[in-house]
Amino acid sequence: MESYNSQSINIDDVEPSVNLGGFAFIMLAAFLGALTAALFLPNWQPSLTQSVSGADPKAFWYLSRGSAFSAYFLLWLSMLLGTGITNKLSVLWPGLPPTIELHQFTSIIGLAFGLFHGMILMGDHYINFSLAQVLLPFATSGYKPVAVGLGQVGFYTMLIITISFYMRKKIGPKTWRSIHFVSFLTYILVLIHGLLAGTDTSAIGAQLFYLITGGLLFFMILYRILVSRANAREKKMKLQAIPPKPPTS
C-alpha cells in the first residue's frame, strides 16, 4: 500500500492502493479458484465434499454462505470507512491516509469474496447454477430469482464503482463522485439480497448482524449529511460576511 505523510490530502489526487493489474489478478484468482473448486473438486476429492453432510454434499453451500457474509461485511466496512473520510471522523482515528487505503482495499477484497460466493454455487447439487446463471442478473428460475438477481446487480454496481476509481483521471472527479454515490444503492441491494436469499436470515445471530451493521452505517450516513449541511451553512455565512469591494472609478 502507498503511504502518505500528511493528513491534508486532496481525495481527487489519491492513487489506488492496489494497481489495476493487482485488482485484475485478485478478481481472476477468485473466479478461477471458485470455478475450479465447483467443477473439479467433487471428482478429485469426493470424500472431502461428502464429509460435510454425508451422501448429499453441502460443502459448496457452506462455502457460499461463509463467503457471502465476508463479502457483505467487507462492503459494509468499506462504506463505513468512506463515510468516515467525507465527514472527517477518520482524521481522529485511525487517520485519513490509512482510512483511504483501507476503504479501497476492503472494496476490492469484498468484490473478490462476492464473486467467489456466486461462482462456488456451481458445485452445489441443490441449486445447480450454470455459469450463465451466476453471471447474468435475474437469469435464475429456481432458487429465489428476484433476491438472487438483486445481489447480482449489487455486485456489478460495486464492480463499476471500483473500476471507476482507476478511470477517475479520464472521466473527471465530478463524474467519478456521481458514480461513487451509487455505492449507497449497492449496499441496499446487497442487504436485501442477504435478507431475502440467505438461509441464515431467520437466525437471531444473522438478524443482529444485519441490524447492527445496517444501523451503524445509517447513523454514519445521517451524520455525514448533517455535517455537510452545517459546513455549507458556515461557508455561506463566511461569504456573506465578506464586505463588498468598493466600486472602482
Ranges and model annotations:
Residues M1-S249:
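Membrane-embedded alpha-helical bundles that constitute the cytochrome b-like, heme-associated redox core
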